[in-house]
Amino acid sequence: MSTSTNPERAQRLSGQSSTAEFRKHTGSDEELIRTLHKLDGRSYPAYKSVVGMWDFGSFSLSIDRIQADPYAPPSKVRAISTPQEMGLPQAAIASPDARAACADYLLRAFNRSLRERRLHDIQVMSPSVEILDRSACTVKPDRVELRFEVRMPARGRTILGHRAAQIFDLDVPDAVQDTFDYLSDIPEVEREREGLLRHIAVYEDYRTLQQILIDRGWVSFIANGSVLARRSGVSQSPMEGALPFASPATLEAEVELPHAGVLRGMAIEPGVTVIVGGGYHGKSTLLGAIQRGVYAHIPGDGREYVATLEDAMKVRAADGRAVTGVDVSSFITHLPGNADTTRFSTENASGSTSQAASLVESIQLGSTLLLIDEDTSATNLMIRDARMRELVQAEKEPITPLVDRISSLHKDLGVSTILVMGGSGDYLDQADRVLMMDHYRCLDVSDRARQVIEELPRVHQNLTMSAPLARRTPARLHSSDRPKTKAAGLSSITIDKINLDLGDVEQIVDPGQTEAIAWMLRGLLYSYANGTSSLTDLLARLERTLNSEGLDAVVKFGAHGLPGRLARPRLVDVAAALNRFRGLRLSEEEPSSTTKD
């Protein structure tokens, strides 16, 4: 530990001005430790005297907020350094992609240090297997910042100053040095350096692969050798002994990546792709890998070289969700009561209306790839066989199934679809290609499917899919006297007294995304909305703000201080949350339907 005091450096790294009740200090690590010892036995609020910036030599430690009492959320702390002081390789800061991957790796390294050292008084955001932009760690060309929390020890409300001194004299510096030290000439540091460079290489390869999708007009690519199966339904760890993916020869393509070099794998072209196969043979596993391919994955995950268009949207039924002013007329018409389905609203959507709304909302937001699994879909929205068409005449059936619109969806609107169908062959007529999963082996059975179509023809319709009519313009909402913004897990949000369930938005993969979405919803509806800007305009404004200010932009929406547990969500997922929010109101909203079919 350094014993030097460098006030100018500490002030430069702090990024914050002085605040109030207790003066913010600029002092050495030794001064901090002495102060904590002196606080032993005092009442808990005296801990606030250590708020400030402290120089630990190779890094500065900023104690930004002290918890109100021993049972409150823990105190907020930042470790701040520079890439040069840390000895980071130049490759780690050479580009925005490299810096993003570096930040992700450093956060994982800090988590690992806390676990291995069993430092339970120090907490930090625990990342998922996806490489995301997270507020817990940021890397810039001249600054590295790590945000975490420390539970300040006490007996009752009496400060345990000697224990606190130990935490800041040993535990915090040890964990930070484990994370920040790339200068030491020891095997452990060399392994970390190699791991960091590997992490960056995998992320840069993934970003290149996503650009290749755009350049070549593909919607997804799965490299040969990828491990798609997961250990269990509640684990994202790869299944041990799983059969590596191998592309059908007819769909195999070659890509060249900057680090991995030449890879071969399955390239999925635009249009309608149907995945078939027996139960438990890997259909949903393949679709699951494709839907998570909108994110980069860490080395060793097995899906490092699986990439999907980043605006791809998994669409499913969600009984009971709210729908506000959505044009579902391509799928739902002449409802009982003559409700206007060009501007459909309900507080309690059925399976079919909820999925129809999700389809249309995704299209309106510019998604060019829809992902659908029959297991989580409304059957009456997906198919309607000949017998049912004969029994229930068209004029008595308000639902037009997706199978009648899916070809037009691509030809007229440029929206591709990948769907899993194991129980109905109705989509074979519409498919541009048919994949079969057989004991986790992927086969191209498009030719055989065409033979089946000829042998067993079905009467079907190819109806035109029109672009949604409604221009949706959110009205500004007004907050309660005691505003509340809360998120929990992957799917639960509360804004004031309104609860929001995002369980059907399957591509939210990190609790930090859910928390970020909660604050972004408050910003969109309580700050940005003005009754004249469309939903897409509001989202574009939000994206510009995030690009220029980062995740800290949510502070202007009411988030406290320097948030350390946020992960950046995709804009389409923010929009999906907004579309499900029961408080959403549209400007000049027309009378709505509350019908549930």
Tell what function each PLM region has.
Residues 1-217, 228, 578, 587-597:
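N-terminal accessory targeting/assembly segments
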Residues 160, 321, 331-352, 384-399:
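Flexible beta-alpha connector loops of hexameric P-loop NTPases
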Residues 229-264, 309-312, 316-323, 329-331, ...:
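N-terminal pre-Walker A segment at the start of P-loop NTPase domains
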Residues 263-292:
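Glycine-rich phosphate-binding P-loop
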Residues 292-303:
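Post-Walker A helix-loop "phosphate-sensing" segment adjacent to the P-loop in P-loop NTPases
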Residues 350-362:
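Conserved alpha-helical scaffold flanking the Walker A/P-loop in AAA+ ATPase domains
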Residues 362-406, 410-411, 420-429, 433-450:
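Conserved P-loop NTPase nucleotide-binding/switch module
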Residues 411-414, 420-597:
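Conserved NTP phosphate-binding and transfer environment spanning the P-loop NTPase/kinase superfamily
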